[in-house]
Amino acid sequence: MDIITLLSGLSQCLDETSIKQLAVIAKAMVTMSGQVTMLGMSRWTERGGSYRTIQRFYNKVIPWGVVLWLVFSKHLYRPGDEYLVVGDESVVSKAGQETYGIDRFFSSIFGKPVRGLAFFTLSVVSVNERKSYPLLVEQVVRSAQEAAVVSPKPTAKQSKAGKPKQTSGKVGRPKGSKAKDKRTIEWTPELRRLERMGKSLLERITPLCLIRHLALDGHFGNNNVTQVVRQSLNLHIISKLRNDSALYLCYEGAQHGVGAPKRYGAKLDYDQIPTKYRVHASTEKQIQTEIYQATMLHKTFADPLNVVVMVKTHLVTQKKAHVVLFSSDLTLAYEKLIDDYRLRFQIEFNFRDAKQFWGFEDFMNVNKTPVTNAVGLAFLMVNLSHILLARYRTTFPDFSVLDLKALFRSRRYAQEALKLLPDFVDPLLIAQLLDAMPPLGAIHSEPIFTLNP
């Protein structure tokens, strides 16, 4: 399937010139080697893909959310499949001072804050295919107030111990203070971004399929995000709590006649979880796995939580480790909750491919519009590569992005060589020669041309 054919449905949001430019750029990206920058692309583009053309394309305002949605709905959506929305933030390292939105963001790869750009992404995961398709990407740009909160400047010298001196006075809740409504939250730019992007995505996908859950990593495992997901998006959250979270079992004893009904029972001891909550136990290679599920309470959350605790024990050393997952959907079975949270990691493969193959880490643009277009183009190529790979993986499951790029690159070399032949060469013969070209530099050396229809 030709790339221009895949992009033909974008006429709803792009003009004909932009579609042609995008097709030339996309074909160069899937063919080229080296860094995916504007200059690098211009060295691999065919006729109509000069550096100035690429530069003009990068300075256009393009609705990437609509572009990604049209590609997904036309080529990747499968009626009848179950879908899950997942979200995560990715950080790309950048140097200098001029790039739009540059700041210090925490990178899980480096394990510390690094200088760079951050982008929040929402994708749709097919539960049947177990693949993630990014549909919305937005840059995280901190205001001056946010930056001051994240990294405040010290205003006074602290003691040698590094802790401020405590002032004398009564400890505890001030007299006369009222209980706060946990369903009323303090909105932050991060919560506004999640609400805005979530509503935009649901408006597009709801007519096609029913979405019930939004899976997020442990950074979003708090009451504020849960209330946004429940109240604004009308979805159920699936996320992770800290492994030392103070969880309480629901009180099951007799209620006293005076005062508010007692809600909190015994505090959960992760080393001695009651066996009546155990729903699964297995042993493999001296590792015992126990899974517990119960409806529990957390004092910072407004509503009860469906909590799943996975405990792994090394039978020789008796060392233990546990993970605490939760959902606001109290009817969700433990197998489904665990599986949906595992599917959240599919978005990490989108980030990996975008950085490794499609220029998410390589772009050198500094202004807002070119930066947005470079990132949108990278995630568009992630979705286009899914479509192109599906053509070969039906027969050759191990066919990878590297094999795809090797195949396109080999055909490009063949095209340049065939231009040296006389003009009377049969076009049908040229097409057959291109199909028979071996993928030079491919990871898998099987003859790819035997897979072509």
Language-model region placement:
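Electropositive nucleic-acid engagement tracts
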Residues: T5-Q21, M29-Q97, D103-R104, L201, ...
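Electropositive, glycine- and tryptophan-enriched low-complexity nucleic-acid-binding patches
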Residues: R52-R56, I109-I211, D303-L325
